[in-house]
Amino acid sequence: MLPLLLLPLLWGGSLQEKPVYELQVQKSVTVQEGLCVLVPCSFSYPWRSWYSSPPLYVYWFRDGEIPYYAEVVATNNPDRRVKPETQGRFRLLGDVQKKNCSLSIGDARMEDTGSYFFRVERGRDVKYSYQQNKLNLEVTALIEKPDIHFLEPLESGRPTRLSCSLPGSCEAGPPLTFSWTGNALSPLDPETTRSSELTLTPRPEDHGTNLTCQMKRQGAQVTTERTVQLNVSYAPQTITIFRNGIALEILQNTSYLPVLEGQALRLLCDAPSNPPAHLSWFQGSPALNATPISNTGILELRRVRSAEEGGFTCRAQHPLGFLQIFLNLSVYSLPQLLGPSCSWEAEGLHCRCSFRARPAPSLCWRLEEKPLEGNSSQGSFKVNSSSAGPWANSSLILHGGLSSDLKVSCKAWNIYGSQSGSVLLLQGRSNLGTGVVPAALGGAGVMALLCICLCLIFFLIVKARRKQAAGRPEKMDDEDPIMGTITSGSRKKPWPDSPGDQASPPGDAPPLEEQKELHYASLSFSEMKSREPKDQEAPSTTEYSEIKTSK
């Protein structure tokens, strides 16, 4: 009796329900060729629970096709034929029992572009196509590029795994093929370059090179690739020192550099690495916590001194290690002459010559054009040479017969240059073995000739003044006419045991013995010229100048 009473109530509730067919799906979907796309979809249809429960089938069709005869693009009905071109690429992903009609489209092709509609069937009562809500699919050209993933930073000498993947791709459709190209790859194992994953052991020279991953779907003309530049971390492998843009030669982490004393020096230290190493210069060989003299790769010395000769070290510090190089700085100088000087001594003419240079120079004496080299002792000369540090000293003793005009020169040289000095001895001793007599006779002759010349000049001047006084009065200049007309030629500086100039003050007159040793290099007389009167009103007078000569 109770079921009969409830039956009208159930009928009343059923009569209030209205059959509803609804579909929620995107109206337009765009996908690149060869990629995948998921189209979310949900639907509803009128169904009463007291009906029988036949299976629920859903279908996706191309727009314009007749559902009863056309092949579907996707369905859950195993008895319906699916289009061969969409087989495996168009798939239903949702649970249709939960009214999920989501559609997965893989390996999209240009011919897939078009409109699609959804249909639901269940038993004899539910057969409905949702023509009002269609899906518009557009397939465009592939512009997506693969991604290259580095599982860890690239470090020189350490194996690193890489992977290549294409965003938006899926397993639907033919498989993807991969290929890797780049200078960092080993040509001995080509199989490793055909996988989506790659193990790479980079080298320092691989930094900055290109690595390319190319993807292609088998059986399709779809190809895409991406190229990346490798960023390889590596410690310094070599250090180069440049001077004026020219690299110095380095042997066994040591470089030798000669520098002229007083010259400016600028050195550049270069150590390629990634990231860049910290460069610094140290004096000598640096200890663990030594303080650098330069915190950059540049070392500047404004004026190189001999005290700076020695070692400098350039160090390149890097997180992966350090490297350093030793520079041996050698300060050199050209020969600098001190001398030569000559003097008469008991054993003969004694000449001395000194040179300073780095390295110490070699010395050579020349008598006229005849070289006198080394330490030797022969009949007419004796040479003695020595060196200490940058100094080289040599002495030359000449004895025996010497020519009247004697030229003695001293020359020094090292690998960087040479310098020489000479002494010209005029009217020297003709023969040291004959003693003082020849020298005295020669000196007396010179003094007699000088007195005659002075007397003749004095007579001519007195005669000229008398003629001027007779013609017109004039006042003579206070200057001594005789001293104004006599000039002495240049001569060499006297030797240490020789006297000073002949016109020395009376208080400094040299001893008689030294006066005997005096020799003139030359003596000349200039042409006499008449002097113009300075004061016309002065009375006519005659002036005499006293001439003093050493005896």
Swiss-Prot record:
Tissue specificity statement from the Swiss-Prot or TrEMBL entry:
Expressed by monocytic/myeloid lineage cells. Found at high levels in peripheral blood leukocytes, spleen, bone marrow and at lower levels in lymph node, lung, appendix, placenta, pancreas and thymus. Expressed by monocytes and neutrophils but absent from leukemic cell lines representing early stages of myelomonocytic differentiation.
The sequence motif named SLAM-like motif is recorded at: 542-547
Q: What membrane topology was assigned to this protein in its record?
A: Single-pass type I membrane protein
Binding-site list for N-acetylneuraminate: R119, K127, S129
UniProt-listed InterPro entries? Ig-like_dom (IPR007110), Ig-like_dom_sf (IPR036179), Ig-like_fold (IPR013783), Ig_sub (IPR003599), Ig_sub2 (IPR003598), Ig_V-set (IPR013106), SIGLEC (IPR051036)
Keyword Hydrolase tagged: no
Per the UniProt record, which residue ranges are transmembrane? 442-462
List the GO cellular component terms: ficolin-1-rich granule membrane; plasma membrane; secretory granule membrane; tertiary granule membrane
Q: Where is the composition biased (Basic and acidic residues)?
A: 528-537
Give glycosylation sites per the record. N100, N210, N231, N253, N328, N375, N384, N393
Q: List where the motif ITIM motif lies.
A: 518-523
* Residue ranges annotated for the Ig-like V-type domain, each copy included: 19-136
- Pfam families (alphabetical): Ig_3, V-set
Is Nucleotide-binding set as a keyword in this record?
no
Q: Which residues lie on this side of the membrane: Cytoplasmic?
A: 463-551
For this chain's UniProt record, which GO biological process terms are given?
A: cell adhesion
The residues the entry assigns to the signal sequence are 1-16
Q: Extracellular compartment: which residues?
A: 17-441
- Domain (Ig-like C2-type): give its ranges: 146-229, 236-330
Q: What does this protein do?
A: Putative adhesion molecule that mediates sialic-acid dependent binding to cells. Binds equally to alpha-2,3-linked and alpha-2,6-linked sialic acid. The sialic acid recognition site may be masked by cis interactions with sialic acids on the same cell surface.
- Entry's free-text remark on domains: Contains 1 copy of a cytoplasmic motif that is referred to as the immunoreceptor tyrosine-based inhibitor motif (ITIM). This motif is involved in modulation of cellular responses. The phosphorylated ITIM motif can bind the SH2 domain of several SH2-containing phosphatases.
The identity of this protein, by name, is: Sialic acid-binding Ig-like lectin 5
Give the originating organism: Homo sapiens
The organism that produces this protein has a lineage beginning with:
Eukaryota, Metazoa, Chordata, Craniata, Vertebrata
Underlying gene: SIGLEC5
